[in-house]
Structures are given as structure tokens and as C-alpha cells.
Amino acid sequence: MLHYINEKATAEEFITIGIYSGWPSYVYVLNELYKATKQEKFKRGALTALSRMTAQATNIGKGIGWIEPVPFSDITGITGEREVIDLSVGAAGAGIIYLYAHRQGLSDDALPLAIKTADRLLEVAQQTPDGLRWLMMTDMPFPFTAPNFAHGGAGVGYFLADLYRETNNEAYLQAAVSAAEYVKTRVHEQSKGFLVCHTEEQQPASTFYLGVCHGPAGTGRFMHLLHKITEDDRWQRWLIDNFEGLVSTGAPEERSKGLWNNYGQCCGDAGIGDYALYLYDETKDERYLAFANRIAKHLVSAEHSSASADQSISWAQAEHRSRPDFTERQTGYMQGAAGIGSFLLHLHSVIQGAPCKLAMPDSPFSYG
């Protein structure tokens, strides 16, 4: 990995600024490797990735932004370039990594760059009667108004709220609260609790994602962070009712439109299970631990054991809901066995009374 990063950086080749798949992810992984091993080469690699992330930014308006190839062109067929602004593939995710780099003492420039990123995001926010919202790109080439964590206002709001903790700039907190108020207007009642629609284009809404990307396990992170910052219990009550909406679908045994044959951290069971464990830690409510155990049992029932001598296990899953028949045995963290294994280890540590999970930059939860 380090060789790959150095090679790409030397050639000044493009790598996306997606927090889970591009330069920001390398900043995080390499710095964590440095912390674990004290080998300076990993710290240098993290700084290299951070430098390349910044080099790909453009001065736009009141801050900085990133112009990249249109995301998901392999699915939509739409090509070209756009300014990407969301958490998963855009500026908000890059901003979160700048905050991480600042807190880790990697760069004196990291916080000023996070501020420039946020100032551009404030500039491109869409004003609505219900509050502020952000889309995946500033100029969407296809209809996709997603209010949740990965590609919508919940993710951008999370970054702005987190930045407020470092700057005490009320403009960031006010924008984050406005984003949360907007999300609250996109809920749909379930038999118990409520869920937020996947996209606003679907009318009436019938698809409700449950995972981190567009479901309670992601948007709940935003609400929990607001609760931590403001100490306003309405945000915690909201995420609890939102989780009740998730449970009311019959998950994980019942697979709804928003919980298809995907078991990973991003869209599926592993991310939901981790979220349940964090809620258990916060509330001591045994229902969350019981739900995490149900998730684990379902994952075990869905795994495929190799007949080879290594006795490996894997999960055949569809990364994209729109292509359920295109399954792969993925190995990554957000999509694949690494993320599923991480949840199972997390659950084991909780059951043993010594909860352990490496804190991620896009999560307000930690045991440290």
C-alpha cells in the first residue's frame, strides 16, 4: 500500500477524495499504522496522501472544493466532471479527514483547510423552507435528493458540527442544526418509530435504507453528535425512535428493500450491528445488545465456508441495491469481510466486558 501511494503521488496521478476509497482513507490507515508501529515511513505516507488530497483541491468561491469525475458513472452512464460535496465521495468527507489530521497533529494546515472546506459547503447549501440541504454534487446531472449520511445533508451536517467543536464558530453549528431539522421533515412513520426516505424523488416513499449510508446507522451518528454538543435530548430521542423504525422492519431476518443481500459496514448488517453496540454502550439498554446478537447470528447463517485447507469464510453480497444479482465476495472494510469481521470482534469484546473498536473519523462513538 505504501509503495502504491508513493508511486501515485510521485506521478501526481488522480485518486478520488472519497473518504472510504481515496486519498483520505490512506491518510487514516497509514497514520493508524504509524501509531501502532512507530515506523516513520507510515507517517510520511499519511502526510503524502494528505498533501495529494489538498493538491487536488480548487479554490472556489469562499473556500476550496474538489472537481472530480461524476460518481457512479458505471451505473448511470453519465460522464463528465462535477464538484463533489457529500461525505462519502466529496468535500465533507475530505473535511472530516482534515479534522482527523489536525487532532492527530499531522499538519498545522489541516484545521485551516477544514475551515476552507466548510466555508465552501456553506456557500453551496440549498436553502429550503425546512432547513439547509446538500446533494452529492453542486450540479446534479441526475435526480438524486438523498437526505441521509453518505450523500446528503446528514453527512455534511456531521462534518460542520464536528468542525464547530474545534472552532466554536456558531455558523457551523447553526448550519448543522438546520440540516438536522431538514432531515426530521423527511421521516415516515412505521408500525413503531420512523424511517427517513432513501431519496425524495420516490413518491410515495417505499424504500428505506437501514445501514450507515442512508439509514439509521449513519444518520443516527449525526444526531448523536448534535446531542453530545448541545446536550439537547431531542436529538437522542430522535435517533432512538429512528432505531425503533429499523427494528419494526423485521431486520435482520426480514430483508426489506433497504436491506438487500448486502452484509457490510456501508449498506448492511455489520454497520447496523456496530451501531447497536454503540447505543448499548451509551444507554445500557439490553435491547441493543440483543439486536446486535441477532445481527451476528444472521451473518453466520449467511456466510460461505471455504472447502480449502485455509478454512476461510466469506459473504457473497451485492454492493448496489439496483444490481442484486451482481454479487461478489468482497474483502474490504466498508464492503466486505474485513468490516464484517470487525463487527463480530466488536461484539465479542462487548460480551467479554472489555468493549473495543477502533474509532473512525466519521463516527462520534468511541471507547477511549
Question: PLM features: what roles do these ranges have?
Answer:
Residues 1-368:
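Glycan-recognition and catalytic cores of secretory/periplasmic carbohydrate-active enzymes
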